[in-house]
Amino acid sequence: MLTLKIAVYIVVAFFVAIFVFGFLSNDPARNPGRRDLE
């Protein structure tokens, strides 16, 4: 099932992007001046 494999890759890439974004932004909760997630 090529469609299933593509869907899995999209989900994995989505979570990895969220993890990398949170890591690079150094937890927005610690930066009161940045409210990107609110």
Curated annotation (Swiss-Prot):
Coiled-coil annotated spans: none
The family this protein is said to belong to: Belongs to the PsbI family.
Gene Ontology biological process terms in this record: photosynthesis
Protein topology in the membrane: Single-pass membrane protein
Positions of transmembrane segments: 4-24
Keywords carried by this UniProt record: Membrane, Photosynthesis, Photosystem II, Reaction center, Thylakoid, Transmembrane, Transmembrane helix
InterPro entries cross-referenced by the UniProt entry: PSII_PsbI (IPR003686), PSII_PsbI_sf (IPR037271)
One cellular component term from this protein's GO annotations in UniProt: photosystem II reaction center
Subunit structure: PSII is composed of 1 copy each of membrane proteins PsbA, PsbB, PsbC, PsbD, PsbE, PsbF, PsbH, PsbI, PsbJ, PsbK, PsbL, PsbM, PsbT, PsbX, PsbY, PsbZ, Psb30/Ycf12, peripheral proteins PsbO, CyanoQ (PsbQ), PsbU, PsbV and a large number of cofactors. It forms dimeric complexes.
NCBIfam families: PRK02655.1 (NF002735)
Functional note: One of the components of the core complex of photosystem II (PSII), required for its stability and/or assembly. PSII is a light-driven water:plastoquinone oxidoreductase that uses light energy to abstract electrons from H(2)O, generating O(2) and a proton gradient subsequently used for ATP formation. It consists of a core antenna complex that captures photons, and an electron transfer chain that converts photonic excitation into a charge separation.
Short name of one Pfam family: PsbI
Organism: Nostoc sp. (strain PCC 7120 / SAG 25.82 / UTEX 2576)
Keyword Cell membrane: no
Subcellular location per the Swiss-Prot or TrEMBL entry: Cellular thylakoid membrane
Descriptive protein name: Photosystem II reaction center protein I
